[in-house]
Each structure stands twice: as C-alpha cells, then as structure tokens.
C-alpha cells in the first residue's frame, strides 16, 4: 500500500496545541475524531480547534458518529430513531465548521436481528432526512459495512439503502475488520467498491471485532491490497487505521507498518 495516505484515530482535541505537538512528533497528518467533542462544544470552539490543528499540519479528516442502540438510525423505537437523526444532523453541522470531509455512520445495531429488513427501511428513512443536510454542509456520510446480525452486513444491503436515497453526499465506509468477521471480505468489497468514499483498516481473528492494528490478526492483507487495486476510480484520499498502535509502538510505527502492506 505504498503511496496510500493514512489517518489515525485520535482524541485530545480539548487541548489542540498539545494534540498537534504529540501527533506531529509521530508523523501524523490526518485524524479521525469521535463525535463527543463536536456535540458538546460550541461552533466557535470547533472552528478554533480545527484552525489550530490545521496550522500545525493536522487535518481532522473524518469523525465517527455516535453508535449503539440509543443512537441507531434504524432503531425500532421511533422516538429513539428521531433523536438519532437529530444527533447526526447536529454532528454534520458542527463538522462543517471544522472542514471535516466525512462522518462515519453505522446503519444500525444488532438489537433486533430478526427485523433486519425493517431496520434497513428505517435506516433509509433516516438517511433521507440527513442527506439534504449532508449536501448543504458538504460533509459526506460514509455508511459502514457491519458485523453479522446487523443491518448493513452485506454489500447488497448497503447498496439497497444508497440506491434508494440516491444522494451524492452518501457513500460507503469499507471496514476491513467487519468484513473479515463476515467471512467474505473480497465479496463485500467487490459489491460496494464503486461507492466507497472512505476506509476503516483494522485486523482481528475473524470472530470478534478486536481492532488489532494491521497486520497483527488474520486478515489476508495481500488479498485486500489486490482487490483494492481493482477500484475503477483510483482512491487518493486518506484511509483511516481504526485501531490503536500495536503495544510497544506509536503512531509512527503504525503508519510505517500499515504502509508496508
């Protein structure tokens, strides 16, 4: 994967100058942040924090939206789902102040595995509300392929939602760890590859979503790189390593090892 730009997951935005010092020392150029900072601070604070990071050579490239039953875009409970939509809408607006390119959203949780078909419909309805906001703010939504027993496990399920909503602000966040747990990483990739707008690179044992740093699990990275190269439009943006560094190492080592795959 030589030549691919890598982002890392990092926090510490409450003290942006320290974050810049720490990240720059490790050779980090871009990060994925979690949503809490954006949802609990003012637009002015978000703007100023992003400016400090940008001046220090660090881009907040993506933000992971809240997830879990209480934040599910496909929650069976209509009130919970409405609140989840509002939270995602607020996040889109806040991320726009920081120049964030994409938020990562889960289609849903495993709270009702016997109702996945209905949950896909509810997720579609939620995204129909969010897509105009994403278009207006110019912050895209990357819908993540999920673990077994979740809506969005297969590539076909993701495309069903994206095709129905039909917005240029929506795409796929391809998660290698989730696809590996489903037993067919290449198959999922082949289905969604023309709709991928961002990546989560992670490794595991093929059973649990362990978030090991690549390549310390059982993902076939040679196979992944091979299928990655079949994308019709060459992917030139950052790919996020959604794991901590392997114990004993730092971000510089993580970036070096993943780049060498």
PLM segments and residue spans:
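Short secondary-structure transition/capping segments
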Residues: 43-46, 73-75, 115-118, 154-156, ...
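Active-site beta-loop-alpha junctions enriched in small/polar residues
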Residues: 9-13, 34-38, 65-68, 108-110, ...
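Conserved beta-strand positions in the central sheet of alpha/beta enzyme cores
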Residues: 32, 62, 104, 142, ...
């Amino acid at each position: 994967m030589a030549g691919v730009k890598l982002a890392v997951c990092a926090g510490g935005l409450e003290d942006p100058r320290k974050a810049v010092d720490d990240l720059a020392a490790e050779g980090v150029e871009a990060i994925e942040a979690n949503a809490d900072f954006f949802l609990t601070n003012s637009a002015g604070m978000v703007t100023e924090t992003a400016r400090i990071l940008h001046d220090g050579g660090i881009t907040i490239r993506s933000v992971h939206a809240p997830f879990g039953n209480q934040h599910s875009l496909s929650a069976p409970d209509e009130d919970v789902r409405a609140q989840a939509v509002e939270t995602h809408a607020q996040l889109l607006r806040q991320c726009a102040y920081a120049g964030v390119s994409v938020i990562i959203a889960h289609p849903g949780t495993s709270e009702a595995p016997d109702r996945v078909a209905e949950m896909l419909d509810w997720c579609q309805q939620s995204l129909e509300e969010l897509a105009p906001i994403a278009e207006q703010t110019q912050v895209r939504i990357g819908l993540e392929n999920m673990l077994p027993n979740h809506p969005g496990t297969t590539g076909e399920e993701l495309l069903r939602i994206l095709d129905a909503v039909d917005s240029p602000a929506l795409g796929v966040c391809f998660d290698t760890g989730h696809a590996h747990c489903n037993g067919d990483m290449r198959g999922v990739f082949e289905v969604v590859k023309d709709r991928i707008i961002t990546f989560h690179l992670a490794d595991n044992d093929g059973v649990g979503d362990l978030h090991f740093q690549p390549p310390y699990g059982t993902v076939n990275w040679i196979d992944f790189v091979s299928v990655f190269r079949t994308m019709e439009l060459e992917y030139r943006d950052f790919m996020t390593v959604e794991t901590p560094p392997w114990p004993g190492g730092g971000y510089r080592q993580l970036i070096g090892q993943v780049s060498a795959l």
